[in-house]
Design a protein with these regions (language model features):
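N-terminal Rossmann-like or analogous alpha/beta NTP/dinucleotide-binding catalytic cores
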Residues: 1-76, 164-182, 236-237, 241
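Short, charged low-complexity intrinsically disordered segments located at boundaries
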Residues: 19, 48-55, 78-81, 201-210, ...
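Short, exposed beta-strand "edge-strand" segments with a Pro/Gly-rich flavor and a Y/T-containing core
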Residues: 32-33, 56-62, 80-90, 127, ...
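Noncatalytic linker/hinge segments flanking ATPase motor cores
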Residues: 40-45, 146, 150, 190-191, ...
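Active-site cores that bind ATP or allylic diphosphates and position pyrophosphate for catalysis
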Residues: 65-213
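Non-catalytic terminal extensions that flank enzyme cores
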Residues: 94, 108-110, 199-252
Length: 252
C-alpha cells in the first residue's frame, strides 16, 4: 500500500486515515507497512543527487506566468487537462541551485516507446510534448514523477495498473528509470469511471465518497465496482470471499 501524499499542503492525515479505513472495511489491508510519500524525502534526495552528478538536472527560475508568456509569444496556448511544454528557457543558463528555484530533468530528444497491456504500442516525444520536466518544485516539494519512480523500485513493483488519464505520464517515468538505472515495470492503463457530465469520478470533481459504515454497505460498494469492471455477480455475504472470487475471475 502506498499513499501518494507528496503534495503535503493538499494532503491531510485525516484524509489518509479515511482512505485506509475504507479499504480495510472492504477487506483490503496492506501486507506491509503503508508507504507514505510525505515521509520519503531522503530517498528522493538520493535519486536527485545521482541525477545531478551526471548533469541530468538543472535549476530553473521560471514561474508559471513566465512560461505562459514565452509560449504565448510562440503561439502556443495552454489546454485543459494537458501539460504545457516547458520552452527550455533556463536549460543553458547554468544557474546555481538556490532556494525558490525548481529543478528539472534534461529530457533527451527522440521518441520513448513502450508496450501497454491494454492500449498496445505507445510512443511519446517528451522533449516536444512536455519538455524538461520538474523533479523538485520551487516550493521545495517533490514532483510526482520522481517520487513514483523511486517508490515503484523500492516497493518491488513489477506491474503498474492505473487509469488511462495517467498514460501520458509513463514516458516521463521511463526516462527517469533509464536515467537512474532502475527497472521498468509493465504498464496497463484502464478506462476511467465517468460521471454523467463526462468528468472522472474523483474528489477533485466532488464525487461522493464510499459509504462503508457497515459490512453490508462495504460489500455493496465492492459489488458496484465489480459491476463496472465487468466482473461476474456472485452470491457472497462478506468482502473477503467476494474479493477472492473476483481475483480468480480477473482476466488481465
Amino acid at each position: 500500500m502506498r499513499m501518494e501524499d507528496v503534495d503535503t499542503p493538499r494532503c491531510h492525515e485525516a484524509a489518509t486515515q479515511t482512505i485506509l479505513s475504507q479499504l480495510a472495511a472492504c477487506g483490503m489491508v496492506s501486507d506491509e507497512p503503508v508507504m507514505l510519500q510525505s515521509q520519503r524525502s531522503s530517498a528522493y534526495q538520493t535519486a536527485l543527487d545521482a541525477l545531478t552528478q551526471t548533469n541530468a538536472v538543472y535549476a530553473c527560475r521560471c514561474s508559471r506566468a513566465d512560461i505562459a508568456r514565452t509560449l504565448a509569444a510562440q503561439g502556443i496556448a495552454a489546454e485543459r487537462h494537458r501539460d504545457t511544454p516547458y520552452p527550455g528557457t533556463c536549460r543553458a543558463l547554468n544557474l546555481s541551485f538556490e532556494a525558490g528555484m525548481s529543478l528539472r530533468l534534461r529530457v533527451p530528444e527522440g521518441e520513448v516507446h513502450w508496450q501497454d497491456r491494454r492500449l498496445g504500442n505507445q510512443q511519446q516525444n517528451v522533449a516536444v510534448t512536455v519538455g524538461d520536466f520538474v523533479l523538485k518544485r520551487s516550493d521545495g516539494l517533490w514532483a510526482y514523477q520522481l517520487a513514483v519512480v523511486v517508490d515503484d523500485t523500492d516497493q518491488g513493483i513489477t506491474h503498474v495498473v492505473r487509469g488511462e488519464d495517467l498514460a501520458d505520464n509513463t514516458a516521463r517515468q521511463i526516462l527517469l528509470q533509464q536515467a537512474l538505472g532502475l527497472p521498468q515495470p509493465v504498464y496497463m492503463h484502464t478506462p476511467l469511471v465517468l460521471a454523467a457530465d463526462g468528468e472522472k469520478l474523483s474528489k477533485q470533481n466532488g464525487a461522493q465518497s464510499l459509504d462503508t459504515a457497515t459490512p453490508e454497505k462495504a460489500l455493496q460498494a465492492l459489488q458496484a465496482a465489480a459491476l463496472v469492471l465487468g466482473l461476474p455477480e456472485i452470491d457472497s455475504d462478506n468482502c473477503a470471499s467476494a474479493l477472492q472470487h473476483w481475483v480468480n475471475a480477473w482476466p488481465l
